Amino acid sequence: MSSNIPQNAVEADTLSNIYTYKELSVDKLKYEYEITVSSDYIEQKINSRLQEIAKNAKFPGFRSGKMPYDLVITNYKNEALEYVINDTIDYCSSDLMKKIEVKSHIHPKVDIMSLPNLDKKDKKGDFLYKLSFESMPKVPVIDLDKINLKKVKAKIKEGDIKEFIDSIKTKFPNFVSVDDASYQAKNEDKLIIDFEGRIRNKLFQGGSGKNFTVNLGSGTFINGFEDQLIGMKKGETKSFKLRFPEDYQVISLAGQEAAFSVRVNDIQIAKDLQSDNEIARRIGFEDHSSLIDHVKEVIDNQCKEMEDLLIKKELFDCLDASYSFDLPIEVVKQEQQRVERELNAKDDSCKEAERRVKLAMLFMEFSKEHEISLTQSDIMNVIVNQYVSKDVSFDRVFKHFKSDGQFQELVRGQALEYKVTDYMIEKASKEEQIVSVKELKELFDNI
């Protein structure tokens, strides 16, 4: 049986005038055009598409490629129309941007206004759609010769080291048992207790313990429990009742009244260590000298981190103030949503988003001008330092990176920012300013 494929179909690409366009609006980076494609072109493209489909079309009772053409039309007309419309939009939109000399664009939006009615013999109507998009702005190249930065450097003194060690000592208190039998327990004392808790005279799960350590004022037990222990003496026993909170995490205990019995086995109070070496050994170091060396290193690393962030902040402020150009609205909107998620607030989110987009575009242009490219190591550093944690493994993050294009774009953007800013700071003119550790912390806190 004949396939009845028409032999006089004209290839649409041979037409000289495929579409016409009309400018609807141009506002800074935003463009809007109305594009009209003749119904003849659409019809010819559909016929060509149907011929391609017919070569391999399958239908019960016919061999592959031998399906009657009228059945091909009936079964595949809508599929062919969708294919042709999408292909036409891609071709015409791309060609239009070349004609109006838009080299790069973002977020094109297509609104189909009308489709031709190919079932009519006359007045089929043309294919009409609206194309909206934003062009990429012309981004200026950063002139490093015009950038002068203040490099803050902290000078570590003995007082800083002593203050740091004193703060560590509070985290490693030295407790000693009280010998005075008349001593009454106070807040911040450590008690060694036996206790039992019962509800309706039945011991509940987790309601008892032997030689259990309680730091008074720590809030380890339910509200009111530790208050009952204040004033008790070593060897004393006390009974009291407390009610569990209504929102207590163990549902079976929530809101229940419990009777507690407590015996104080020992009371320990904080006592200062006498020598520097005792302090060092208490914290886990061989001697005081080793502790000082460690503290110096810790403070130095903390200062370097603050110094780096301060000079980067100054560089960003300088670039933000020195360069101005139109920003793509849709890109800013997307960044604004990210800012609001990060800061959990909408105040100033638009301003911060505009700043981030501007800096990202400046960095991108600078990297092209200075041929700064990313390596695998740059990407890995961002993944490890920014996203891997004790709760999120490297394998999990890297798998997400490989499968999610948006996350890839985010990570690459961060990696490029770090590499470009390091390059700029290294090359830019810098004036060193010596400050104390306290002054450095104040500057950092005011970022």
Curated annotation (Swiss-Prot):
Record-annotated PPIase FKBP-type domain positions: 188-273
Entry GO MF terms: peptidyl-prolyl cis-trans isomerase activity
Gene3D superfamilies the record matches: 3.10.50.40, Trigger factor ribosome-binding domain, Trigger factor, C-terminal domain
Keyword line: Cell cycle, Cell division, Chaperone, Cytoplasm, Isomerase, Rotamase
Top-level EC class as recorded in UniProt: isomerase
Reactions it catalyzes: [protein]-peptidylproline (omega=180) = [protein]-peptidylproline (omega=0)
InterPro entries tied to this protein: PPIase_dom_sf, PPIase_FKBP_dom, Trig_fac, Trigger_fac_C, Trigger_fac_C_sf, Trigger_fac_ribosome-bd_bac, Trigger_fac_ribosome-bd_sf, Trigger_fact/SurA_dom_sf
Example GO biological process: protein transport
UniProt-listed Enzyme Commission number(s): 5.2.1.8
Subcellular location: Cytoplasm
GO cellular component, one term: cytoplasm
Principal location: cytoplasm
PROSITE patterns per record: FKBP_PPIASE
Domain notes: Consists of 3 domains; the N-terminus binds the ribosome, the middle domain has PPIase activity, while the C-terminus has intrinsic chaperone activity on its own.
Family membership noted in the UniProt record: Belongs to the FKBP-type PPIase family. Tig subfamily.
Function: Involved in protein export. Acts as a chaperone by maintaining the newly synthesized protein in an open conformation. Functions as a peptidyl-prolyl cis-trans isomerase.
Protein name: Trigger factor
